[in-house]
């Protein structure tokens, strides 16, 4: 029988932290009738026994709040999308959408309708890693906010499953993150999220390669930071003298990107010289 404990002590503490953060991200969502409606709606859903931790034993309330926060802070999604994030684990059939339209408006209904379509597409497709599936997914979504929420949810999932004992499910989630969600994030200009998805996928799919590169980067961080500082200094001075307002950034390639170069060039970490 599935564990249906609503909150562990740790989850309860995390819930209040996330609630405060989400309220700061979208204060209008916590004002007036809409918030009271959402609060009551979620309470009814949970009271009906529609609280499922799933194969990774993750609390769906915590997960949906984390996805909403990531959607707001890292992607810039607004109120309607965040409400859809919070309702996403529970609204699974089109029959429920009329109530969503009445309670929250057309935008939330459209987003949840797209998410339901994507779930149906997942069930029908034998392989989600192909370019054809990515194109099909975008067309099924109908609204780009659906794709953005899916990317946010998968990023949140990848952050959350590091301690899971379900290795088969973790591997499948990692493959989908690497071959489906990371390319979608790249196409939409979410480069930091794309790199994070790729790095976490490598961490779970090839633990040894990930930590080989990570440990090497950690060991050489001081010298790399100094190299970047010395490289930027004369450029910064010239731009300042010319009267420009500017900001220069420098960063190391992602672990996944370094690993791809190692495979392509058939060399170790020390054989990769363009780390920046």
Regions found by a protein language model. Name each.
Residues 31, 104-108, 143, 206:
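Glycine-centered helix-coil hinge/cap
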Residues 82-86, 150-151:
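Acidic beta-strand-to-loop metal/phosphate-binding motif
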Residues 1-26, 44-55, 60-65, 69-76, ...:
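Nucleic-acid processing machinery
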Residues 13, 29-34, 38:
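N-terminal alpha-helical scaffold/docking segments in eukaryotic complex subunits
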Residues 54, 77-84, 96:
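Short N-terminal amphipathic alpha-helices
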């Amino acid at each position: 029988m599935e564990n249906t404990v609503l909150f562990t002590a740790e989850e309860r503490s995390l819930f209040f932290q996330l609630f405060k953060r989400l309220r700061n991200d979208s204060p209008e969502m916590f004002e007036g009738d809409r918030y009271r409606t959402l609060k009551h709606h979620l309470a009814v859903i949970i009271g009906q026994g529609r609280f499922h931790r799933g194969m990774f034993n993750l609390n769906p309330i915590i997960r949906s709040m984390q996805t909403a926060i990531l959607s707001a802070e890292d992607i810039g999604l607004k109120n309607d999308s965040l409400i859809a994030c919070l309702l996403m684990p529970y609204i699974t059939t089109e029959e429920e959408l009329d109530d969503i339209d009445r309670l929250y408006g057309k935008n939330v209904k459209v987003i949840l309708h797209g998410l339901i379509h994507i779930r149906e597409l997942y069930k029908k497709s034998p392989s989600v890693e192909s370019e054809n599936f990515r194109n099909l997914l975008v067309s099924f979504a109908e609204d780009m906010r659906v794709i953005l929420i899916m990317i946010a949810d998968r990023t949140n999932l990848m952050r959350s499953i590091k301690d899971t004992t379900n290795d088969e499910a973790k591997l499948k989630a990692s493959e989908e993150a690497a071959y489906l969600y990371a390319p979608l994030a790249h196409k939409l200009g979410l480069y930091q999220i794309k790199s994070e998805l790729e790095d976490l996928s490598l961490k779970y799919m090839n633990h040894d390669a990930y930590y080989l590169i990570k440990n090497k980067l950690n060991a050489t961080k001081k010298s790399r930071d100094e190299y970047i500082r010395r490289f930027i200094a004369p450029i910064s001075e010239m731009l300042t003298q010319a009267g420009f307002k500017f900001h220069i950034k420098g960063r190391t390639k992602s672990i996944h990107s370094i690993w791809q170069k190692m495979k392509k060039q058939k060399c170790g970490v020390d054989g990769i010289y363009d780390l920046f």
